[in-house]
């Protein structure tokens, strides 16, 4: 995240760090004891899921927090890695997540029609500037949901199943934020998908969660 600040410990108990061979790869969010939500491009093509771990309950990449093994990753079968559509995936955990003060699920938004031009919150461990380092501390930033019609004009790939944010140059998502949660009113409205790296005053684009709630529910590990 560019232009954010260190998040208070425990404020975002749904935040996940997906780490591949120990290095932060993507954000994700806790849906329930067995399932974590992320972007398809974070897990698509990973041959060895044994090297992918789900870290929860910590704000710091220098700490492991609570670590969970991955049983399976389900990528939306309509995911298009060129058009960046249907960029959504579920990570099934081998053992159930234990909830506590620092580890809690987030609910999914089913109705986001009134969100345009309203505030939302992005969290992640993405770079704090283009080409910059990964921050150790989880970052938070308040953004604004960009009007959909404007976003479709600004970013040619954008369709109805995307949702966008834009505030100003110097604020936004960056590499390593992918797969992480965009939240409004206590519900997740987006999954970080793509943008014009980083924070150049163009909209950031997210998978619109409400468009995929039925897919998510159908593909959860029960």
Curated annotation (Swiss-Prot):
All copies of domain Peptidase S1, residue ranges:
1-221
Annotated GO biological processes are: proteolysis
Q: What is its EC number?
A: 3.4.21.1
What's this protein's name?
Chymotrypsin-1
Keyword ATP-binding listed? The answer is: no
Active site: which residues?
41, 87, 178
Q: Name one Pfam family in it.
A: Trypsin
Protein family membership: Belongs to the peptidase S1 family.
Q: Which organism is it from?
A: Solenopsis invicta (Red imported fire ant)
Question: What keywords is this UniProt entry annotated with?
Answer: Disulfide bond, Hydrolase, Protease, Secreted, Serine protease
SMART domains per UniProt:
Tryp_SPc (SM00020)
Intrachain disulfide bonds = 26-42, 151-164, 174-198
Q: Where is this chain primarily localised?
A: secreted
Localized where?
Answer: Secreted, Extracellular space
* Gene Ontology, cellular component aspect: extracellular region
Q: Coiled-coil intervals in this record? A: none
Q: Name one GO molecular function term.
A: serine-type endopeptidase activity
Q: Which reaction does it catalyse?
A: Preferential cleavage: Tyr-|-Xaa, Trp-|-Xaa, Phe-|-Xaa, Leu-|-Xaa
């Amino acid at each position: 995240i560019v232009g954010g600040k260190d998040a208070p410990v425990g404020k975002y108990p749904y935040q996940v760090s997906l780490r591949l061979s120990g290095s932060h790869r993507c954000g994700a969010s806790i849906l329930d004891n067995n399932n974590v939500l992320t972007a398809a491009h974070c897990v698509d093509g990973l041959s060895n899921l044994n090297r992918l771990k789900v870290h929860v309950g910590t704000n710091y990449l220098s700490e492991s927090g609570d670590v969970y093994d991955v049983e399976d990753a389900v990528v939306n079968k309509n995911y298009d890695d060129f058009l960046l559509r249907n960029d959504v995936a579920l990570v099934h955990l081998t053992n159930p997540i234990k909830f506590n003060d620092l580890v809690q699920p987030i609910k999914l938004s089913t109705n986001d029609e009134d969100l345009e031009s309203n505030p939302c919150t992005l969290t992640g461990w993405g770079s704090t500037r283009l080409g910059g380092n990964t921050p150790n501390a989880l970052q938070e930033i308040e953004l604004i949901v960009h009007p959909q019609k404007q976003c479709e004009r600004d970013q040619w790939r954008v369709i109805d199943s995307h949702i966008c944010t834009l505030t100003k140059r110097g604020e936004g998502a960056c590499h390593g934020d992918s797969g992480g949660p965009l939240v409004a009113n206590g519900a997740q409205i987006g999954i970080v998908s793509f943008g014009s790296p980083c924070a150049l005053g163009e909209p950031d684009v997210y998978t619109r969660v409400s468009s995929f709630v039925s897919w998510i529910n159908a593909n959860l590990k029960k």
